[in-house]
């Protein structure tokens, strides 16, 4: 007679096996930021500064015109999602600037 398991039906029924764990495909890693590309982007940002539209958007964010800044950036970058990401990035930069200024004083 076969070995009996506590469950005859349901999710836990049948022969217990160990799951075969596979590594994710290399083609799935696209879009993930590497250390090197982050370093290069930071270096470029330090050397070149901000584009004129980014400076104007930052001015709008400084005076709490978030919606107007989003509409302005969307017009420049093309899509709503990219605009939201850019607005978030610029507001984080402004917060870091404020933090650095407060630390300096």
From Swiss-Prot:
Write the protein's name: Large ribosomal subunit protein eL36
Organism ancestry: Eukaryota, Metazoa, Chordata, Craniata, Vertebrata
Question: Per the record, which residues fall in region Disordered?
Answer: 14-36
GO biological-process terms attached to the record: translation
Instruction: Spell out the InterPro entries in the cross-references.
Output: Ribosomal_eL36, Ribosomal_eL36_sf
**Which cysteine pairs make disulfide bonds?**
none
- Name of the encoding gene: rpl36
Task: Give compartment(s).
Answer: Cytoplasm, Cytosol; Cytoplasm
User: Which family, according to UniProt?
Assistant: Belongs to the eukaryotic ribosomal protein eL36 family.
Q: Which residues form the signal peptide?
A: none
Might you report a single GO cellular component term? ribosome
